[in-house]
């Protein structure tokens, strides 16, 4: 198998891994609020838009490195009244949890691939 074929195969595997387990939801307290019922619900559905991979010259843990570009549909609301937002509108800790889930899933199945995420 040529290096290009290996990269194409990894591209397909990354897409399958991310796109298969691609939903998250939860709620967060509104900033600067001390009321226990002042919160927002959120839900996110994401899919891979593009994968950019290359073989690492010298590697200890990562044989392949790259970036995964993600399209994310973000909905924020309260009691079922949803509005569409972008990933940057979520609190940073929620975005971090989403990134961690995606990266953990990739690392679990492809430990020799080290990628970062970019949300479109």
Positions of PLM-derived features:
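Short acidic DE-rich linear segments
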Residues: 113-120
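Acidic, low-complexity, intrinsically disordered interaction modules
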Residues: 27-112
């Amino acid at each position: 198998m040529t290096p290009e074929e290996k990269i194409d195969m990894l591209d397909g595997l990354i897409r399958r891994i991310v796109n298969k387990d691609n939903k998250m939801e939860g709620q967060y307290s509104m900033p600067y609020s001390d009321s226990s019922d002042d919160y927002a619900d959120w839900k996110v559905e994401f899919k891979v838009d593009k994968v950019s991979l290359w073989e690492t010259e010298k590697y200890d843990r990562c044989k392949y490195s790259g970036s995964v570009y993600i399209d994310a549909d973000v909905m924020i609301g309260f009691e079922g009244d949803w509005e569409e937002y972008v990933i940057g509108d979520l609190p940073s800790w929620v975005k971090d949890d989403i990134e961690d889930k995606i990266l953990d899933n990739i690392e679990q199945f492809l430990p020799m691939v080290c990628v970062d995420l970019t949300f479109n």
